From Swiss-Prot:
This is Nucleoprotein. A motif (Nuclear localization signal) lies at residues 70-77. GO terms for cellular component: helical viral capsid; host cell cytoplasm; host cell nucleus; ribonucleoprotein complex; viral nucleocapsid. The modification Phosphoserine is found at residues 479, 510. It comes from Measles virus (strain Ichinose-B95a) (MeV). The modification Phosphothreonine is found at residue 279.
Length: 525
């Protein structure tokens, strides 16, 4: 048996191991297409700001081809460094594209104010053709700008500080698009607006240079469909992270936005580790979880072997990303989602409608959190030096806090996932019973008895105070009391209806201990 277990562990480890890069064959080369990237040919701020203005106008034109749009975006993304050409050549390693750099300088003879640097050759016409979209009169909006503030006609500046603020504002809006351009483009607008408000409050961006939604949609769609552009953006992020010492302000902002980009599309894997394993609830000892725990361990080792590109595997369309989906560990994922819903309010908005979702293990996670409330881990207590008296004090305080949170209907018990609670009694999970359940059931019984007594006494008092509608009302008495006879009759009718509803609810309460809820399996199908 020991040999079998060792062989099983070795099999699982080799099964999830990434393929070895070395081999007898050579590198596979694909058919490359050429991308032209305009970069500044001198160190003048005027050249850079004019190039930025022309590229922003170029990107907003819907008639621009895909490769030309990618080249313009790469040119904007690399404008904040001192030598954009060296940066692009250093970090670009794409088997699908071949990048050609074109240096751009100022020119008074061209309509765009720019020309391509060359040795003795007049390139003004080619520059005008490139920056004017082949037809200068085709788009009035491209000439007026793509900012929400239509008073901004151009973004040409002379000082470096103003240029950095404008460039940082535009780059922030582009980088934020990468966070959900691949994983959730339909719900990206709300999160992008929250990031914009955050950086505006931090004075990292200028609110007047907010780009139009149409312009942002064009860039988001291009990021989603062009893998080469995403490869360049990820390579740029990794290059910034490797830079020692202090970084430029725009580089620090890109690293800050990276916290929303990293691990995009890996929420199931990360949340399963966070709520399913790190919480260390005793439910992990179930035999049903043994195989999936081994799978998750192999995936964690594989994640580490992938290196610095592992958090971006979904953005980079790495085929190994399918191993990390929740379908590889459905029971453990369902259990972790139940734990997460009870512990964090933000988990209530997640979509659990998957074909491999198991409601039973989801409820198992919920019950583990509820019935373990106030308990102190003996292992952590010994490591932290917590005495038994301190542990009892913590448990008592935690129990009161949990009861107060539930009584105020604020916290982990959310309405979004209320349909996932079982429509059976508390005896559905016999292994999770205890003294707390007996106290809860006893309290429910006492509450029902007191409700019946109080309801019957109130009903008798009401019947004595107000006769039923079948008895004729004394109009003279009603007139003397200052009430309208019709109002008194309507009040009596309403009181009788309330009494009838109370009787129905009382009969339902005596039949079942738990309220009737929908069947979660029917709703998830």
């Amino acid at each position: 048996m020991a040999t079998l277990l060792r062989s099983l562990a070795l099999f699982k480890r080799n099964k999830d191991k990434p393929p070895i890069t070395s081999g007898s064959g050579g590198a596979i080369r694909g058919i490359k297409h050429i991308i032209i990237v305009p970069i500044p040919g001198d160190s003048s701020i005027t050249t850079r700001s004019r190039l930025l203005d022309r590229l922003v106008r170029l990107i907003g034109n819907p008639d621009v081809s895909g490769p030309k749009l990618t080249g313009a975006l790469i040119g904007i993304l690399s404008l904040f460094v001192e030598s954009p050409g060296q940066l692009i050549q250093r970090i670009t390693d794409d088997p699908d594209v071949s990048i050609r750099l074109l240096e751009v300088v100022q020119s008074d003879q061209s309509q765009s104010g720019l020309t391509f640097a060359s040795r003795g050759t007049n390139m003004e016409d080619e520059a005008d053709q490139y920056f004017s979209h082949d037809d200068p009169s085709s788009s009035d909006q491209s000439r007026s700008g793509w900012f929400e503030n239509k008073e901004i006609s151009d973004i040409e500046v002379q000082d470096p500080e103003g240029f950095n603020m404008i460039l940082g504002t535009i780059l922030a809006q582009i980088w934020v698009l990468l966070a959900k351009a691949v994983t959730a483009p339909d719900t990206a607008a709300d999160s992008e607006l929250r990031r914009w408000i955050k950086y505006t409050q931090q004075r990292r961006v200028v609110g007047e240079f907010r780009l139009e939604r149409k312009w942002l949609d064009v860039v988001r769609n291009r990021i989603a469909e062009d893998l080469s552009l995403r490869r360049f953006m990820v390579a740029l992020i990794l290059d910034i992270k490797r830079t020692p010492g202090n970084k430029p302000r725009i580089a620090e902002m890109i690293c800050d936005i990276d916290t929303y980009i990293v691990e995009a599309g890996l929420a199931s894997f990360i949340l399963t580790i966070k709520f399913g394993i790190e919480t260390m609830y005793p439910a992990l000892g179930l035999h049903e979880f043994a195989g999936e725990l081994s799978t998750l361990e192999s995936l964690m080792n594989l994640y580490q072997q992938m290196g610095e590109t592992a958090p971006y595997m979904v953005i980079l369309e790495n085929s190994i990303q399918n191993k990390f989906s929740a379908g590889s560990y459905p029971l453990l994922w369902s259990y972790a989602m139940g734990v997460g819903v009870e512990l964090e309010n933000s988990m209530g908005g997640l979509n659990f409608g998957r074909s491999y979702f198991d409601p039973a293990y989801f409820r198992l996670g919920q019950e583990m959190v509820r019935r373990s409330a106030g308990k102190v881990s003996s292992t952590l207590a010994s490591e932290l030096g917590i005495t038994a008296e301190d542990a009892r004090l913590v448990s008592e305080i935690a129990m009161h806090t949990t009861e107060d949170r539930i009584s105020r209907a604020v916290g982990p018990r959310q309405a979004q996932v209320s349909f996932l609670h079982g429509d059976q009694s508390e005896n559905e999970l016999p292994g999770l019973g205890g003294k707390e359940d007996r106290r809860v059931k006893q309290g429910r019984g006492e509450a029902r008895e007191s409700y019946r007594e109080t309801g019957s006494s109130r009903a008798s008092d009401a019947r004595a105070a107000h006769p039923p509608t079948s008895m004729p009302l004394d109009i003279d008495t009603a007139s003397e009391s200052g009430q309208d006879p019709q109002d008194s009759r309507r009040s009596a009718d309403a009181l009788l209806r309330l009494q009838a509803m109370a009787g129905i609810l009382e009969e339902q309460g005596s039949d079942t201990d738990t309220p009737r809820v929908y069947n979660d399996r029917d709703l998830l199908d």
